[in-house]
A protein has these predicted regions:
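Walker B catalytic acidic pair
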Residues: 105-107
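Phosphate-coordinating catalytic segments in nucleotide- and nucleic-acid-processing enzymes
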Residues: 1-86, 192, 207-210, 217-220
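Surface-exposed alpha-helical segments enriched in charged/polar residues
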Residues: 32, 93, 121-124
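Conserved D-loop-proximal element of ABC-family nucleotide-binding domains
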Residues: 112-113
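GG-anchored amphipathic helix commonly corresponding to the ABC/SMC/Rad50 NBD signature/C-loop
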Residues: 74-102, 118
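C-terminal lobe/lid and adjacent interdomain/linker elements of RecA-like ASCE P-loop ATPase modules
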Residues: 61, 118-220
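Short, well-ordered loop/turn elements at secondary-structure boundaries
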Residues: 37-40, 97-98, 151
């Protein structure tokens, strides 16, 4: 198992066996994936400095006129979501190569859903996922409640009791396929979720808080 807690704050630390100081190491696979994702630079690579043993992620720019290359720290130039994707992608590759199970908390934080859907589809593709790697993640985004992405038994919900703070885990397939709450294969899961068909949804209304604050300001 590879477990990523708080994927939104994950940082990948790269080390090289015999690094050259100030050299830029561009990993072909990660760089190609980053370009598909949509980086703002010409490439991404890792730089080892004199005072830091760990390689740092840099955005690489190439001047087409004088052929010179400039590297800028990626956290200055790239978006937070782009850096998260670049940090996570090598772990996806490792899982696919070893047939491992990748468990990710907040898998979709700051990353475009289309990129994540592509990764999910790769895990589902038996022609690509030849070692039968598995992906398990949690999310607050209902866009993944999609029959084209997951089987009913692959979609899980967590229902929390506000009084006891106990949580119950159950699958979409637990509802069966018949009756008023039955779930059929090609239904619109997301729409049904928003009308509380499956539970695990909370009605949140901050209006009273704002009304109280603004009312106090008005009276003051």
């Amino acid at each position: 198992f590879m477990v990523i807690y708080r994927a939104d704050s994950m940082q990948l630390i790269k080390r090289f066996a015999d690094p050259k100081k100030k050299a830029i190491y561009v990993e072909k696979t990660t760089d190609e994936a980053a370009k598909l994702f949509g980086i703002n630079s010409n490439a991404v690579g890792y730089v080892v400095s004199d005072d830091e043993p760990d390689a740092k992620l840099y955005s690489v720019f190439k001047n087409m006129k004088n052929k010179k290359t400039t590297a800028v720290a990626a956290d200055i130039f790239e978006s937070y979501g782009t850096i998260r994707f670049i940090n996570m992608f090598p772990l996806v590759i490792k899982a696919m190569q070893t047939g491992g199970t990748l468990v990710v908390d907040e898998f979709d934080a700051s990353i475009h859903p289309m990129a994540l859907m592509s990764i999910i589809n790769v895990f589902h593709n038996d022609d690509v996922n030849i070692h039968h790697a598995q992906l398990i993640f949690n999310t607050h985004n209902p866009i993944f409640l999609n029959s084209n992405l997951f089987r009913r038994d692959e979609i899980k919900f967590v229902e929390r009791d506000d009084d006891t703070h106990d949580s119950v885990l159950y699958a979409l397939s637990d509802f069966g396929t018949t009756g008023d709450k039955g779930v059929r294969k090609h239904e619109d899961y997301m729409s049904k979720y928003f009308i509380s068909q499956y539970g695990a949804i909370k009605d949140i209304d901050f209006t009273p808080i704002f009304e109280e604050i603004l009312c106090d300001e008005k009276e003051g």
